[in-house]
């Protein structure tokens, strides 16, 4: 007991002193009264309760931290998904605008090239070729009137016989001038209807075909 008294630890109760592993009687005391013992137990309970409270506070704090961490991560992911969806939508719009622009450019380039090639041909020969192709569509008709540009009408009349001989089914073939038509213009009138075989009309049909093809390609890529 004397060794215990010499350690110099601070007292918690008048009859005990703190030892790392247990409680011991204070110096000079040999008898532990019941009320003092009960007081000691109460103190130990308070210390234990305080430790438990501290541990619970730490646990709660850790739980709150994890919750906030998870909420922050989820909020970040939600924001990233929203940004991703926005970027995808903007990219799709840009692609559509690009396709439309390229479609227009390609159509213009092709048509310009076709017109340039056609301009290198003799206009009368080209008109006769157009008439030939148009007559092939109405070769089962007996009477056909061919309307052409007034500047070409005389020359076409002189040479139409070379074309007519390839279509003996057509018994009557007349060439007439039409001021509404440009060089290369050609309209065929028959008993069943009218056919516009003009060069400009064929180029316009080519333009529509190019636009349709490019549009179908764009739809296929989007799917």
Swiss-Prot record:
GO cellular component annotations of the record: cytosol
Record keywords: Cytoplasm, Plasmid, Protein transport, Transport, Virulence
Induction: At 37 degrees Celsius in the absence of calcium.
Traits of the deletion mutant: Deletion mutant does not support type III secretion.
Subcellular localization: Cytoplasm
Protein transport is among the record's keywords: yes
One GO-annotated biological process of the protein: protein secretion by the type III secretion system
InterPro entries noted in UniProt: Flagellar_FliH/T3SS_HrpE, T3SS_SctL/SctL2, T3SS_Stator/FliH
Name of one Pfam family that matches: FliH
Summary of subunit composition and partner proteins: The core secretion machinery of the T3SS is composed of approximately 20 different proteins, including cytoplasmic components, a base, an export apparatus and a needle. This subunit is part of the cytosolic complex. Interacts directly with YscN/SctN (T3SS ATPase) and YscQ/SctQ (the major sorting platform component). Forms homodimers.
NCBIfam families: HrpE_YscL_not, PRK06937.1
Family according to the record: Belongs to the SctL stator family.
Function: Component of the type III secretion system (T3SS), also called injectisome, which is used to inject bacterial effector proteins into eukaryotic host cells. Acts as a regulator of the YscN/SctN ATPase activity. Overexpression of YscL/SctL abolishes type III secretion and down-regulates the expression of secretion apparatus components.
Name used for this protein in its record: Type 3 secretion system stator protein
Organism: Yersinia enterocolitica
Gene transcribed to yield this protein: sctL
